[in-house]
């Protein structure tokens, strides 16, 4: 078991497929099959023949064949999910810990330093953003967090969430399942597990959103307070951050191992951070100059060429 660091909350959560299915964002499932978001609306259609026929008819004649293909894909996916419904194969691990920012780094529980990259061009917010801006500065310097003049809510200014989720191989897998079909569906379950776990953390464990009442569509549209950037996201592009996450979470607790380049196995795994600041938002780091690359490599204690490889994953 991982060491329980002081002033932190560590949890391992296990879910059945049945519990996680409602949180699946079908848009990304169909995207993996090369289909536009409008075809994902089949997931919202009543299962009666009349409603399904009306859905097909809502498309142009040129697109109705593709709509039927989408319906078939969805039906096959639902059948597999029913087969796996009672299997507890969706697992998550999370840590809520005291944190403070120091420059473009976040120090977790005073012992693990996580360096981040900063935008070098002003974004939509009017700032050059870095994820460390959403955590209170050690000396309460004039950073983005202090400029917002927002009082801490349940210590959201000095707390960071770290998480990982994974989906293990279903026992009731049919030999006829295509590898790509299994891969895309378990990928969606891993993301859905992260969605469900994040909701529980906001409402019950971190507790800063106890009264949150959002529909599934609102959850998928990220209408909640806070963000959950995953490793590999545009604001967190360095895959080697997984090694620091492993140091904090001990990913093997839920069956995840890391390759030498920081990739997770099983492939249907998600890892990242949770920020609760009311003004936290997603952004893209974009291009960085050689000066920041050199500084970041120094803070990550790696060679520049090595960092370039992690950023190119």
Give residue ranges: language-model regions.
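Active-site loops and adjacent core secondary-structure elements that bind or stabilize anionic groups
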Residues: 1-7, 11-174, 179, 183-184, ...
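C-terminal accessory domains/tails appended to large, multi-domain proteins
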Residues: 124-313
């Amino acid at each position: 078991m991982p060491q329980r660091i002081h002033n932190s909350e560590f949890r391992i959560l296990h879910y059945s497929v049945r519990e996680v299915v409602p949180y699946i964002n079908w848009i990304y499932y169909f995207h993996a099959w090369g289909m536009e978001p409008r075809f994902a609306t089949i997931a919202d259609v009543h299962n009666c023949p009349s409603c399904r026929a009306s859905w097909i008819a809502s498309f142009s004649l040129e697109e109705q064949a593709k709509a039927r293909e989408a319906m078939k894909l969805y039906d096959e996916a639902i059948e597999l999910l029913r087969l796996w419904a009672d299997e507890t194969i969706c697992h998550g691990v999370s840590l809520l810990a005291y944190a403070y920012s120091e420059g473009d780094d976040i120090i977790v529980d005073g012992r693990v330093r996580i360096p981040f990259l900063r935008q070098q061009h002003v974004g939509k917010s009017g700032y050059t953003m870095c994820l460390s801006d959403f955590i209170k500065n050690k000396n309460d310097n004039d950073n983005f967090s202090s400029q917002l003049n927002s009082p801490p809510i349940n210590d959201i200014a000095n707390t960071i969430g770290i998480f990982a989720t994974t989906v293990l191989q279903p026992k009731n897998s049919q030999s006829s399942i295509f590898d790509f079909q299994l891969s895309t569906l378990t990928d969606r379950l891993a993301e859905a597990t992260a969605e469900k776990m994040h909701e529980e953390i906001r409402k019950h464990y971190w507790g800063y959103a106890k009264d949150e009442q959002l529909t599934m569509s609102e959850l998928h549209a990220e209408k909640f307070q806070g963000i959950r950037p995953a490793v590999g996201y545009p604001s967190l592009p360095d895959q080697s951050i997984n090694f620091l996450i492993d140091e904090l979470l001990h990913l093997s607790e839920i069956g995840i191992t890391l390759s030498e380049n920081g990739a997770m196995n099983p492939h249907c795994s998600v890892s990242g951070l949770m920020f609760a600041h009311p003004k936290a938002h997603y952004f893209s780091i974009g291009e960085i100059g050689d000066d920041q690359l050199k500084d970041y490599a120094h803070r990550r204690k790696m060679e520049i060429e090595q960092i370039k490889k992690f950023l190119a994953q």
